[in-house]
């Protein structure tokens, strides 16, 4: 399962804005943040849709508690062991 989560994290991180969201939630806001807050704090493009985050919830990368998105425990464990997944250099 961790291999699948690691692979999904790596796939999601290929998108610059998704990588910014994941890094922000992992490193800066482990308590989570609402979608509108993420859009405002990270200056996401207006056409960035919340459905993309919902897909990561379905993939068990994020948790949504009704108001805020957070990194899921299993995804956090993968990132704790291998944080380079979120580094741009790793993705090249």
Language model region names:
Residues 43-58:
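Short amphipathic alpha-helical interaction segments
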Residues 57-68:
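A short, conserved structural fragment
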